[in-house]
Amino acid sequence: MSTSTVELFVDPACPFAWMTSRWLLQAAEVREITPRFRVMSLAVLNEGRDLDPDYRRSTDQTWGAARLAVHIARTEGDEALSRWYTAWGERYHVGGDQDDRRAVAEQALADAGLPAELISAYDNVPGDEVDQALRASHAEAIDRVGDDVGTPVISFGDGAEGIAYFGPVVSPAPKGEDAGRLLDGLRALASIDGFYELKRSRTGGIDLS
């Protein structure tokens, strides 16, 4: 049986995107899909917006990991990005190692078996090739789903012609057949022309279990 690709656009710093990515990997174990992680950027998304100063500082700290992620995808491929993202998330989100993000990103390269010199892409240089690639990848996500959402963005179907939504936001990440059933439901919604949004307020924090 052939598998279909499900793309998930993430900012590596977003804990909710991390949870969604773990669900998608679980779903791939029980359904015939190939997960493909793509990169979007909370920093790009919030450029020019009037934000609370604390949130602005937090957002400005997300450039590096997103730059490195898109650079890995461009130079080493999707599978390498998946390995690095998992290594990064285990340290940054699960382990709570968030004091020196650049060091965490560098350690994740080693964990993922990737060249150490890739870390050079981490440092933000507006307008360089990595910056342009990050903005292009982010724009692809926004073109599919609209500009009033954040990360993650999930996309079903054939690339830019597919159907994309913000989310799903999950905590904890469903496992086993629960992960598969959630995927089934989302794919069913994506098959309905004219369906746009379904939402409820979160009642708890992040559960990384």
Locate predicted features.
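Extreme N-terminal starter segment of soluble prokaryotic enzymes
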Residues: 2-7
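Residue-level detector of alpha-helix boundaries and kinks
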Residues: 9, 53-54, 126, 171
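Conserved acidic functional residues
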Residues: 11-13, 155
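Structural alpha/beta surface segment adjacent to cysteine/selenocysteine redox centers
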Residues: 12, 18-105, 185-189, 197-200, ...
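C-terminal cap of thioredoxin/glutaredoxin-like
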Residues: 23-25, 99-209
